[in-house]
Amino acid sequence: MSETGCRHYQSYVKEHSYDTFRVIDAYFAACVNRDARERKAIHCNCFECGSYGIQLYACLHCIYFGCRGAHITSHLRSKKHNVALELSHGTLYCYACRDFIYDARSREYALINRKLEAKDLQKSIGWVPWVPTTKETNLLLANARRRLVRPNQTIGLRGLLNLGATCFMNCIVQALVHTPLLSDYFMSDRHDCGSKSSHKCLVCEVSRLFQEFYSGSRSPLSLHRLLHLIWNHAKHLAGYEQQDAHEFFIATLDVLHRHCVKAKAEHESKSNSSGSGSGTNSSNSSSSHCYGQCNCIIDQIFTGMLQSDVVCQACNGVSTTYDPFWDISLDLGETTTHGGVTPKTLIDCLERYTRAEHLGSAAKIKCSTCKSYQESTKQFSLRTLPSVVSFHLKRFEHSALIDRKISSFIQFPVEFDMTPFMSEKKNAYGDFRFSLYAVVNHVGTIDTGHYTAYVRHQKDTWVKCDDHVITMASLKQVLDSEGYLLFYHKNVLEYE
């Protein structure tokens, strides 16, 4: 790999120098002064369709602006021009390579322009160019050719050894490893433990597991270290008897959440120790699940907000409370109202979950509006949704009379819209469509059985994970399965 990373850009610079890049970056990407900002607002639009906004490109060979996709691509192809500048972030694109490219000299000029922009706006610079380390440079030199993961490749698929009734753990790990946002986080090496005893950190162990899954090896993995860590931090799961997969899932999220918060607190404590000496004590917050106060990767992906509205039947006064959730547990048994109907689909379950429930005379509560004890109704709705929604179908029923497993078939969709279940349906902002990517199943009775999982490996490829055995599966097999835990990923992510 050359210093520029692209021989086409190297040829361009020899012929045209950096002058055009410096001008376009200064006036249409960085906008170094007020005149540049006004010029961009007036003239920076696609020459073909006239669109403004993000994802506009400027051809560095001639005076042409085109939007991402057909227009800039058509221009570069027809004119036999190779290099364009993306104007939102100032990144170089080579049409011949079909990729964004890096050039050290261009980055130096771009940084100068960003400093001028920051000075003109009287703000700190919020953009820093990527400068590869020696290690990264060597990796790039050794891997100059791009590697494509094709649909028929099995990278990311690993069987998991059953250590003695640990199928409940294996299927949850398969679901977590195939959670796209979680995979992006751990595969980009975002976790920095900062602890002297990283061998006790569950986040470090999960990070190592992700690396193992995507190492290219096909031999089954042993999760003995993960199991040991869970036993140490969730004592109720310790032992070799069969455990509940849902309980293990929630316990794993809780321990990961606590360890993420602890790692952050230790970093802050180290930085504060060199200042005023007043360290940060987060021992209490590390064990709490505080929605809106924690930005760890677990809460960013899995935490949503449940809204509960209690309506007084006397004065119609409404008392609203909010609670964070990591999953939604749905009843499958017969209802005591509506003719004792049992749900047939996931939508039926959600409709029953969000239906107003009359609390009755035996459960009167004091109304904060009329200041008296009155009968009331209670209704759940979803205030906010996480990036990943996990549904727990409550198939194991425990009562004073009988313990049983509900094996009735519940139809669940590949994709569906959660808007009808939001607290503010009419004013709900955003896209609430979700796609199925993992299903955990239980085969057997309430006393004994076996867990397996279906996971989406590629866009249209599903596999069945049965401990150390991984086999291809059809979508029909997935949708025909019983379903115990259902994992859905949001189709469109909003970034703040």
From Swiss-Prot:
One of its GO terms (biological process) is positive regulation of DNA-templated transcription. Its EC number is 3.4.19.12. InterPro entries: Papain-like_cys_pep_sf, Peptidase_C19_UCH, Ub_carboxyl-term_hydrolase, USP_CS, USP_dom, Znf_RING/FYVE/PHD, Znf_UBP. Residues 158-491 form the USP domain. The active site is at residues 167, 450. Disruption phenotype: Defects in the number and migration of glial cells located within the lamina plexus of the developing eye; the lack of glial cells causing mistargeting of the R1-R6 axons in the optic lobe. Lamina neuron development is normal. Zn(2+) 3 binds at residues 59, 62, 75, 81. GO terms for molecular function: cysteine-type deubiquitinase activity; zinc ion binding. Expressed in the optic lobe and central brain. Highly expressed in the lamina precursor cells but not in differentiated lamina neurons. Also expressed in marginal, epithelial and medulla glial cells adjacent to the lamina plexus. One of its GO terms (cellular component) is nucleus. The keyword Transcription applies. CDD domains: Peptidase_C19D. Zn(2+) 2 binds at residues 46, 49, 67, 71. The keyword Signal does not apply. It is found in: Nucleus. Its main location: nucleus. A zinc finger (UBP-type) spans 4-120. Pfam families: UCH, zf-UBP. PANTHER family: UBIQUITIN CARBOXYL-TERMINAL HYDROLASE, UBIQUITIN CARBOXYL-TERMINAL HYDROLASE 22. Component of the SAGA transcription coactivator-HAT complex, at least composed of Ada2b, not/nonstop, Pcaf/Gcn5, Sgf11 and Spt3. Histone deubiquitinating component of the transcription regulatory histone acetylation (HAT) complex SAGA. Catalyzes the deubiquitination of histone H2B, thereby acting as a coactivator in a large subset of genes. Required to counteract heterochromatin silencing. Controls the development of neuronal connectivity in visual system by being required for accurate axon targeting in the optic lobe. Required for expression of ecdysone-induced genes such as br/broad. This is Ubiquitin carboxyl-terminal hydrolase nonstop. It comes from Drosophila melanogaster (Fruit fly).
